[in-house]
Regions:
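Glycine- and hydrophobic-rich flexible loops that cap the catalytic core of alpha/beta enzyme folds
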Residues: 1-176
């Protein structure tokens, strides 16, 4: 069987859909985006949506290893952006209620099905060391709990970056 390299453009709704389950391999660097990079991403997205431009917004490239027909995708490049977008979605969800909140949360976690005994699943799995933290605060939409944590008590720099970028996004949304 020959291996193929293919490229495709997807809208954000498809990127965070049941078509993909992203896994960050252990060999990838930890989450390292600074508040500056996060602020630029937020500003770019805000400006694009405020202009109501008919053109597509290029969010950047993501390189995956993924078999056709499979949800699981190993993230080779783009993990910083995917992680930051998930933090943004969680921050937005924390400010919403009802159906609006649910519509945002399904971009962070697949719904599952109690009748089929399928549990909800995160769409993004970080490196093992940071996944429990990310799952609890970001994928669990506990933004207030995350922001209340003492950064000196966190296990590593990746967790502090998650908190700081969440704070940056939270403040930016509140200012809008």
């Amino acid at each position: 069987m020959s291996k193929m390299i293919t490229g495709a453009e997807y809208p954000l709704g498809k990127v965070f859909s049941d078509d993909f389950e992203y896994h960050i391999p252990q060999y990838q660097r930890p989450y390292a985006w600074t508040t500056e990079e996060t602020g630029v991403l937020f500003s770019d997205l805000r400006d694009f949506f405020m202009e109501e431009d008919e053109e597509n917004y290029f969010l950047g490239s993501t390189v995956l290893i993924k078999q056709d027909g499979e949800r699981r995708a190993e993230v080779i490049d783009g993990q910083q952006r995917l992680t930051t977008l998930t933090i943004l979605l969680a921050t937005i969800a924390s400010k919403l209620s009802g159906v609006q909140r649910d519509n945002c949360v399904i971009r962070i976690k697949s719904q599952g099905d109690i009748f089929m005994h399928i549990e909800e699943q995160p769409r993004l799995f970080l490196r093992q060391r940071d996944q429990p933290f990310f799952s609890k605060y970001i994928q669990g939409i506990d933004i207030d709990g995350l922001l209340a944590l003492d950064p000196t008590q966190m296990e590593d720099e990746a967790q502090r970056n998650i908190q700081e970028n969440c704070r940056t996004l939270n403040n930016a949304i509140d200012e809008e």
